[in-house]
């Protein structure tokens, strides 16, 4: 991936090369532009394409929310599985974050100097991983996927994707920000990635599988796309 600043608008432009035929532009949260381009297209062609869309970018940029910036302080609102929680920040014996037995979202700090953001995100990773593991158990059974096909699941910060599947190795990655989204959206992403074990790319066969296993996947996808990213 390469990054440059468009001189006409001042927007950050992220360029991702893929085996596609055309150049596509997308407006992302945080007032940035994502360009997916064919691998053989020159950087000059990409820059010219962005420059030719200045009016379009300016129009749609006004509709995109600013990137959410958290301070990780008591009372700040965070979402877990689509539900809003006021954060409680406490001092305790060890650094950790999660939902308490009383249903409260807590960030526990060993000292006031502890890295709040890192501790919070680590706690959210654990929460999301547990949910995704449950989804894998449910859907690998329904889709008759052998356990040996799944070799690893990781959670990481992903700015432009919700998940990825390496079908050859059986390794999956999911965006940490999914922890803020409703469970039905998380399930849709899991099924999406599992379908890639049977169909590479987004072919007609792939979408036939999605329709078979999750008939309302488009509705779930629209809901997911409508929600702002929080943990990126």
Report the location of each language-model feature.
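Walker B catalytic acidic pair
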Residues: 193
């Amino acid at each position: 991936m390469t990054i440059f600043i468009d001189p006409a608008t001042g927007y950050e432009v992220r360029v991702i090369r893929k085996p596609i035929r055309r150049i596509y532009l997308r407006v992302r949260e945080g007032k940035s532009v994502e360009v997916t381009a064919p691998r053989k297209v020159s950087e000059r062609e990409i820059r010219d394409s962005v420059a030719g869309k200045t009016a379009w970018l300016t129009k749609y940029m006004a509709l995109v929310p600013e990137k959410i910036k958290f301070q990780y302080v008591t009372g700040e609102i965070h979402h877990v599985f689509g539900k809003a929680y006021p954060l409680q920040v406490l001092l305790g014996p060890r650094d950790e974050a999660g939902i308490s037995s009383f249903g409260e979202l807590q960030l526990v700090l060993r000292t006031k100097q502890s890295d709040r953001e890192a501790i919070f995100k680590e706690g959210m990773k654990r929460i999301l991983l547990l949910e995704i593991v449950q989804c894998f158990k449910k859907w690998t059974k329904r889709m008759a996927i052998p356990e040996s096909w799944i070799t690893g699941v990781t959670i990481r910060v992903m700015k432009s994707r919700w998940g990825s599947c390496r079908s050859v190795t059986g390794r999956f990655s999911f965006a940490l920000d999914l922890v803020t989204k409703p469970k039905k959206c998380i399930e849709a992403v899991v099924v999406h990635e599992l379908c890639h074990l049977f169909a590479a790319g987004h072919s007609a066969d792939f979408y036939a599988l999605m329709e078979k296993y999750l008939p309302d996947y488009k509705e779930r996808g629209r809901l997911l796309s409508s929600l702002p990213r929080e943990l990126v």
